[in-house]
Structures are given as structure tokens and as C-alpha cells.
Amino acid sequence: MVKYALLPLVAVSLVQAGGPEWHHSRTADFAVDPKVHKGCTSWINVVDASGKLTCDAFLDTINVAKRQFIFWNPQLNSDCSNIQSKASYCAFLPSHVSKQTRGQMDPPPKTKPLPPGLFNDWGNNHAQKRNDPPPKTKPLPPGLFNDWGNNGARKRDGLSPTGGLGDFHGPKEAPPPDWGHKGVVEGNHGNTMSTRSPIMGTGLPEQQSEPAFMPPHIPNLPNGMENKMVVHATTLTKKLRPTGSYVKRDANAPAPTPGSVGVAIVGCKQYHTVKAKDTCFNIAQQYPGLLFSDFLRLNPPPSNLDTVCSNLKANTRVCVKGDTKTNLVPTPSAAVGVHARDVQGWPSPTKPGTNPGCKSFELVKKGDSCEGVARKHHISVAQLKQWNPAVGPTCEKLEIGYYACVRV
């Protein structure tokens, strides 16, 4: 139904020299075709239709769609090109009048009246006497009841010996009118488990409880980390710190000496000597508060560890405490490692070089620009470039479908 604010109903006249002439008013000033819907409260009065006048000339003025205008004026053709001079056309039909009129256009199908004393039984599609007794049905044997869902009868105590109420079926819906004519079936219908309520006759399904939340699976974790980290789906921007609750710190680790194997790190305050089975992850977990990304910053390549921590060797020293800002190096997103990004809850994909301490991301969509993304998150374009160096100095490499860091 067309909804619009009706223009002030004063006569609106549009006259062109030697062209069509029409005006808009509350009354029909000319002849009205019998096919026009009754109840119109606004009219287009065409004085002169010369020059191939169509309804497109005044539809914008009355704010009505062409198909709606033709519906109100059925004498018009599909392209509304047969407008006549000295004729009035309906320009507005109130909603209640339109509904009544459409109802008159499509009358309900005529049905043959039933003889007196009969009524129509819609369920069986035939007429019955109103005072007829219900059809006789064969009584059920003792211990059986009618199962609407399976359209048959079964034993009342036909429960699974191990499933409790697993085989109990309540009614799925109200019994059909001819349920009494269905056959009687005795026996078990199978071991299908059912959670439907055992209360008979309610016809209401039992409310299903939501399954318990299962944390997402983190593939290819290093040894000793299976099923120990919990990543919640709603905390993608939260960085999780290793707690060290299930890994004991090596209190007897030998202090570094000038003769130890490894390269000294400027500003390092504490070292860890790598053992045969150590990994970068379990080393970081032995020191509460030490993030994996900070561990990589404290041991920058090429002197100690590479960007994915694949060259960790036994009997070498790695730094586990120091000023991460002093040893901050440009670290690509791969430096955080696939496992670290999964544990931190980073979305995917991200560009190489994304700030490893990022806490919030924005998915780049079609039409986005660095200025628009920065303005949306109340940061400067310079900060956006600093946290996402892969976008380039002029943001020419801001690619659709990648996540950009917008908060650290």
C-alpha cells in the first residue's frame, strides 16, 4: 500500500504552450470511467492530453507509483499512454477503501449450501449430521495407548531398558479427526531416542536446552599445550597471557656466564638456558607475565631467534626479562607465530607486519580508506600506518578482506 504525505489539495496546474494541460484537485471535474475504483479523495483532471501525455508527467507530483495509479484506474493500459482529454483519473484511494475494493474484485468462491442439520467437517472433507455420534472404534487391548505421532497404538510401558524415557512418544499435535480408524500396532517402534515431554495431551514441544559452549580447537599446538588454553569466541580482541599454572618454573636454572653459548642481548636482565626438549612456548610459560610476542622481541633476529622461533637450540641462552621497548624490532605477523595468533584470538587473515600487540581489528570492506577506518576508530592515519606497515606509505595497499589493526 502506498504511504506518503498527501500534498496540500489545492489546484495545481501545469500549462505549456501548445502542450498538455492538467491539474490536481479534490474533485473530479470531468467524466470518470466506470472502471475507476470508488472512494477516491484526490483526482488528476486532464484538460488537454495532446502531445502524447502519459501518467509519468504527474506521478512525481502526486508521489504515486505507476502500477498503483493504473490499479486505481483500470481503463489505462500497461504503459499509461492512453490518457484522454476532458477526463478525470483517481490519484489517491484511502487504504481502507482500497482493501474493500480489492476484496470486491476477488469474491470468495461460491459453495453449495448444506442441507439443514448438517455441518461441514473440514478434516474429512465431507458433511456430517451435527448430532451424529462419533464413529465407533475398536477398543485397544489392556496396556496399550494410542500414539498420535506414529498413528498407531503401542505398549504404555514400552520404554528402553537403558534409555529411560528414550522410547516414550507424546503427541506431536492434536489428534486427527479420523485417528480412531487407524490400525493398532503392538510392539516396540525402535530404540530412537526422544526428548519430547512424557506429559500426554499437551501438544506442546519440550523446550530444548542450548548445548554447552565448547572452545574452538587450536590445531598443531606444541607438546604439553593440548586442551590447556581456552579461547572464548566473544573475546577476539583480548590477549591471553600464559598463567604458568601447569608448568613449573625451573628455579635451578644456571645463571648465565660469560662463557655460555649464545649472544648477549643489550638490556637483558635475566637469561634462560635452553634444554633439549624446550620450545619457545614452554619457555615463555615458565615466566609468568611473559608474552610470547615479548619473548620474540627480547631475542630479535638474526642474533638469537628467527621470526618463527624455528632455530631454538639446546645449550643456548635466550633472554626472558628485559626492556622490550629497547629491543623492539620490526616484527612481521609471522613472528608472533601461528600458535601465538590462535592463542591471542587474532582474526584471519592479517597482513605481514601487523603490530603483534594489537588488541582490536577492523575488516577492510569495499569502499574503505585509511582515513575512513581511522576516523571510525578515533585514531590518526599515522597510527593506522604504524600498526599496519603493509598498507604502504600512502595506504595504496589497503586490501579488501584483510583485518587491519586499529588498537594496541
Curated annotation (Swiss-Prot):
* Residue ranges, annotated region (Disordered): 98-178
> Is Lipid biosynthesis one of the keywords UniProt gives this record?
no
Alphabetized InterPro entries for the sequence: LysM1-like, LysM_dom, LysM_dom_sf
Query: Per its record, what are the GO molecular function terms?
Result: chitin binding
Q: Gene3D superfamilies, from UniProt?
A: LysM domain (3.10.350.10)
Q: From the record, what ranges are coiled-coil?
A: none
The alphabetical list of record keywords is:
Chitin-binding, Repeat, Secreted, Signal, Virulence
Biased segments, Pro residues type: 106-116
Signal peptide (UniProt feature, chain positions): 1-17
Q: What are the GO cellular component annotations? A: extracellular region
Every copy of the LysM domain together lies at 42-91, 270-320, 360-406
Q: What information about domains appears in the record's comments?
A: The LysM domains bind chitin and potentially related carbohydrates, and might be involved in damping host defense.
What's this chain's function?
Might have a role in sequestration of chitin oligosaccharides (breakdown products of fungal cell walls that are released during invasion and act as triggers of host immunity) to dampen host defense.
Q: Which PANTHER family match?
A: AM15, PEPTIDOGLYCAN-BINDING LYSIN DOMAIN
Name listed for the protein in its UniProt record: LysM domain-containing protein ARB_01488
Which species is listed as the source?
Answer: Arthroderma benhamiae (strain ATCC MYA-4681 / CBS 112371) (Trichophyton mentagrophytes)
